[in-house]
A protein has these predicted regions:
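A short, acidic, amphipathic alpha-helical segment used as a generic capping/interface helix at domain edges
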Residues: 249-266
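FabD-like malonyl-/acyl-CoA
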Residues: 1-136, 268-300
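Glycine-rich phosphate/pyrophosphate-binding beta-alpha loops
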Residues: 56-58, 196, 251
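Non-catalytic positions within long, well-ordered alpha-helices that form the structural scaffold/packing
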Residues: 72, 181, 262-263
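Alpha/beta catalytic cores of group-transfer enzymes, especially the acyltransferase/condensing modules
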Residues: 11, 36-39, 96-249
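Short, flexible loop segments at boundaries between secondary-structure elements
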Residues: 230, 290-311
């Protein structure tokens, strides 16, 4: 069985999609129909502008949509799909929940809402390497108590064994890092992001998204989607809207999501980039599964050659 996994914010790079745009009219159509800045910032940057959340998100999703459309034209569709944070929206596009126009518009709105949620607040995210979940969670809780003043730090991403990301107010994150180092954390890497994503500080963005969702007719998923917040498929009583509203302000359980997909029989993962960071996480979770990534036309041709006829049609 095949699972598509979609990259999240941070994987963007100047030049992404240019080779696809020049070779495949179907891909070019996606970029041409997107807001004009998508093509401009994807192809020419500058990297600082492409890295602004309100622009990163529609640019990343336009790339993912374009590649997904090419795969679909080849008859390659997944049995399961999931995405890292922003990538969840691309997974839902793959499943037919959103149209191309809807998903690019929606993530542009999401990116702006996430930026606006923390205006005037100094935030930070950091990747903690080679430390167990329980210790990291305990240090975050202790750090919050130590700094007080309503400052927040919590786990944002459970990426893979040995890599967990914490997020929140800068002072609280710095305190958590100090506590983690005292507990023996080998390495803590600050991340170049523009907000305390996947914490309760993103509640204003979640509230705005909830209102925005009222304007959209959510389609019935044609592919099984595994959600960031729950690391499973949708359950009775849950809605996609509710899960997405919570996702922006809750921990992302990527490792658990990948393990769930493997437990359901997925043995081949295709990362739709740009970048190859999620593929590395998958290999750390289970070295026996097959993992391929699509960052370039050369990658795409290799994946099609390997999979043609091997997926659902």
């Amino acid at each position: 069985m095949v699972g598509f996994i979609y990259a999240g914010q941070g994987s963007q790079r100047v030049g992404m999609g240019k080779d696809f745009y020049e070779e495949y009219p179907l891909f070019a159509k996606t970029y041409d129909n997107a807001p004009s800045y998508v093509k401009e910032y994807c192809f020419d940057g500058p990297a600082e502008t492409l890295g602004q959340t309100r622009y990163t998100q529609p640019c990343m999703v336009a790339f993912a949509v374009g590649v997904t459309n090419l795969l679909k034209e080849e008859g390659i569709v997944p049995d399961y799909a999931c995405g890292l944070s922003l990538g969840e929206y691309s997974a839902l596009y793959t499943a037919g929940v959103f149209t191309e126009e809807e998903v690019i518009d929606l993530v542009a709105f999401r990116g702006a809402a996430m930026e606006e949620a923390v205006v005037g607040r100094t935030a930070k995210m950091a990747a903690v390497l080679m430390m167990d979940r329980e210790t990291i969670e305990a240090c975050c809780k202790e750090a919050q108590e130590n700094v007080g003043d309503g400052l927040i730090v919590s786990v944002a991403n459970y990426n893979c064994p040995g890599q967990i990301v914490i997020s929140g107010d800068e002072k609280a994150v710095d305190e958590a890092v100090k506590l983690l180092q005292e507990k023996g954390a080998r390495k803590v890497i600050p991340l170049a992001v523009s907000g305390p994503f996947h914490t309760s500080l993103m509640k204003p963005a979640g509230d705005k998204l909830a209102k925005k969702f009222e304007e959209i007719n959510f389609g019935e998923p044609s592919v099984k989607v595994v959600y960031n917040k729950t690391a499973t498929e949708i359950q009775d009583g849950e809605t996609i809207q509710g899960l997405l509203e919570q996702q922006v302000q809750s921990s992302v359980y990527l490792e658990d999501s990948i393990r769930y997909m493997i437990s359901k029989g997925v043995d081949t993962f295709i990362e739709i980039g740009p970048g190859k960071s999620v593929s590395k996480f998958v290999k750390k979770i289970d070295k026996d599964v097959k993992v391929m990534s699509i960052d370039s036309v050369a990658d795409y041709k290799q994946v099609v050659s390997a999979l043609k006829g091997g997926c659902n049609e």
